[in-house]
């Protein structure tokens, strides 16, 4: 599951590429922490029982992660208070904290809605203006990252806009970060100059990224089993999640003709579901090696509509 930049301490693009065992190509560059939370979201979400650590480490091995790195990642997520560790004799398990569960539930809501249906827009814009002293560069970076995650784009320096009704949310987020001077409004915009308000986003670049993912989905047709199915499915999910940080969810009226968001969502959902039975069987195998009774808890998640 994708992580909010300010709530997880995990950069969307950090980490090294991990080759999925048996997969036809490597998972794209992504942090190991993101891979772990994606496994929780896709296979153990809404399960109150903690997941055996050995099963997690095994699944992470399917994604190309060596055991020492996998265990170090679990320890890091515990320090970030996204996972909690339990010990019962020699057995160790990991479960989501309330904070980790909230992040996954937020991501689940996004997955259920983004690209599923056309976006209805009332023509108004959320506008955020803020001022942060140049000396506080770390705060400036965090504030901008958070606004991008919420779907805002920079119209001018210190002026960010979004067609979604998220002005109040943005104000609350920035004040919580410690931004001292924030003004928000919801209003009509009359922007002079070429491109209009849409120039706040790199729509050409986002369109190219959709094209890359379309080619990946077209190439992903093999009937995979075992580790290869789990790795392929996780890689596709992580690639789709990345669009949350680059596609602001603009309505059709603001987009170029034939914007591919809904088409790609449909392709992704179908392929994700096709890989589901084999990937879930692999995850159950990892869990059953430690505790056969817990294998029933592996989630059967489907995205197609």
Where are these regions (language model features)?
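Short alpha-helical segments that sit at the start of domains
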Residues: 2-6, 10-42, 102
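Short, amphipathic alpha-helical interaction segments positioned at domain boundaries
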Residues: 101-125
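Short, hydrophobic-biased segments on the C-terminal half of alpha helices
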Residues: 71-75, 92, 144
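C-terminal regulatory/effector modules of DNA-binding transcriptional regulators
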Residues: 197-305
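Mid-protein regulatory/catalytic core that forms ligand/cofactor-binding pockets
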Residues: 133-223
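Glycine-centered, phosphate/nucleic-acid-interacting loop/turn motifs that mediate DNA/RNA or nucleotide
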Residues: 81
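Short, Lys/Arg-rich nucleic-acid/phosphate-binding segment
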Residues: 87-93
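Short acidic, hydrophobic short linear motifs in intrinsically disordered regions
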Residues: 47-59
């Amino acid at each position: 599951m994708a992580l909010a930049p300010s709530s997880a301490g995990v950069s969307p693009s950090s980490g090294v590429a991990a080759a999925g065992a048996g997969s036809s190509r490597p998972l794209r560059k992504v942090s190991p922490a993101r891979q772990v939370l994606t496994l929780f979201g896709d296979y153990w979400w809404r399960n109150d029982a903690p997941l055996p650590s050995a099963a997690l480490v095994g699944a992470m091995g399917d994604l190309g992660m060596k055991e020492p790195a996998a265990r170090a990642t679990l320890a890091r997520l515990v320090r970030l208070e996204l996972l909690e560790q339990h010990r019962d004799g020699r057995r160790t398990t990991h479960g989501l904290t309330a904070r980790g569960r909230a992040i996954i539930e937020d991501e689940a809501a996004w997955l259920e809605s983004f690209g599923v249906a056309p976006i209805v827009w009332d023509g108004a814009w959320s506008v955020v203006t803020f001022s942060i002293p140049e000396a506080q560069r770390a705060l400036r970076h965090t504030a901008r990252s958070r606004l991008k995650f919420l779907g805002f784009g920079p119209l001018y320096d210190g002026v960010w806009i979004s067609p979604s009704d998220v002005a109040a949310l943005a104000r609350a987020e920035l004040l919580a970060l410690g931004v001292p001077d924030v003004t928000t409004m919801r209003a009509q915009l009359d922007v002079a100059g070429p491109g209009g308000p849409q120039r706040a986003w790199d729509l050409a670049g986002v369109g190219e990224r959709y094209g890359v993912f379309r080619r990946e989905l077209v190439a992903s047709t093999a009937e995979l089993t075992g580790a290869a199915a789990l790795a392929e499915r996780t890689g596709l999910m992580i690639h789709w999640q990345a669009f949350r940080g680059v596609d602001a969810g603009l309505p059709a009226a603001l987009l170029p003709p034939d914007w591919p968001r809904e088409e790609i969502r449909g392709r992704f959902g179908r392929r994700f579901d096709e890989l589901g039975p084999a990937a879930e069987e692999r995850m159950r195998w990892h869990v059953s090696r430690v505790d056969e009774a817990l294998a029933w808890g592996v989630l059967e998640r489907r995205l197609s509509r």
